[in-house]
């Protein structure tokens, strides 16, 4: 019997398994952690998270946690016992000024970030161009802020690092293992039935994500899940125009994030609306719906309709001269 069974081998599930197993080692417990994944670990990592790690946030608590996360990713050996290369290119945030040529919301945000020792500083157009080259289109009507601590993670490197950390910590990994049924006695989950047999555990962690409601509804647990569809596009670019060492561009004028991949690819995705109305609408449709789950962050441009790809192209043309 395992101390803990983590169901779901995405980034969060894998990180949970690694941390739990290391904690058990630290307190001299000989018990084991098992990580179950229906396909292979972090299969959607390249498209789903875009590898952007930044901390500036309107919510102070979120900023503090994100800043800690940045520190952990930068020195992963202290946390997981393995090293990982990160790309520290920083991030440039862009937003419209008001009629007076100011952006009081971001000015106030910059001051609040100072109080938690996070640099989110206003820069001028010339500094922006210096950091990005003349490929970026700037305007006097916009405000530019620089977050030097923001970093990028290459998803393929992250995936390899997760496998190394799981091996290093001694987690039992079961890939291509699909959970059919969660088994319980009274109100306690005791085991799960899979295509590779029954797996027993004292504790179970739900890291299934969008499919949680489907899996756990069989034992009467209602887990509300709603997902806002987000699609991404990737363009091949010339290294003479957009270099790999390009800052993350958080473009709130055109509502789009840009980052450069290795091999001179330009990645773009639009931020989620995080609208209370939109989320409520999804919940009204189905309290436990996987609404949009099958479309979430498709990595291939071919999966998007032409008008959506064209939308990204139009946005990119407003920000980049090439």
For the regions a protein language model found, what residue spans apply to each?
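Dinucleotide-binding Rossmann-like beta1-alpha1 core, especially the glycine-rich loop
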Residues: 50-131, 141, 255-258, 293-296
């Amino acid at each position: 019997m395992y101390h803990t069974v983590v169901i779901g081998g995405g980034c969060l599930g894998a990180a949970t398994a690694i941390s739990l197993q290391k904690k058990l080692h630290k307190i001299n417990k000989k018990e084991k952690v098992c990580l179950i994944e229906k396909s292979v670990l972090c299969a959607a990592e390249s498209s789903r998270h875009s590898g952007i790690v930044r901390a500036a946030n309107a919510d102070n608590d979120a900023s503090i946690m994100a800043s800690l996360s940045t520190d952990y990713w930068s020195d992963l050996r202290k946390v997981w016992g393995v090293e990982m290369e990160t790309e520290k290119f920083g991030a440039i945030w862009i937003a419209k000024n008001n009629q007076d040529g100011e952006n009081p919301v971001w000015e106030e945000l910059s001051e609040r970030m100072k109080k938690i020792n996070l640099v989110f500083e206003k820069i001028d157009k010339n500094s922006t161009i210096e950091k990005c080259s003349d490929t970026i289109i700037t305007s006097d009507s916009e405000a530019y802020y620089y977050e030097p601590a923001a970093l990028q993670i290459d998803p393929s490197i992250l995936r390899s690092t997760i496998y190394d950390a799981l091996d290093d910590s001694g987690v039992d990994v079961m890939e291509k293992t699909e959970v059919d049924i969660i088994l319980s006695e009274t109100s306690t989950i005791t085991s799960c039935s899979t295509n590779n047999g029954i797996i027993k555990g004292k504790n179970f962690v739900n890291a299934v994500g969008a499919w949680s409601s489907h899996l756990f509804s069989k034992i009467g647990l209602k887990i509300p899940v709603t997902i806002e569809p987000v699609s991404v596009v990737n363009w091949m670019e010339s290294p003479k125009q957009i270099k790999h060492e390009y800052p993350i561009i958080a473009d709130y004028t055109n509502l789009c994030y840009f980052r450069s991949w290795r091999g001179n690819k330009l990645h773009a995705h639009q931020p989620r609306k995080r609208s209370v109305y939109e989320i409520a609408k999804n919940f009204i449709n189905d309290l436990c719906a996987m609404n949009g789950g099958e479309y979430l962050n498709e990595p291939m441009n071919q999966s998007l309709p032409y008008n959506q790809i064209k939308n990204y192209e139009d946005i990119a043309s407003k920000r980049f001269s090439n």
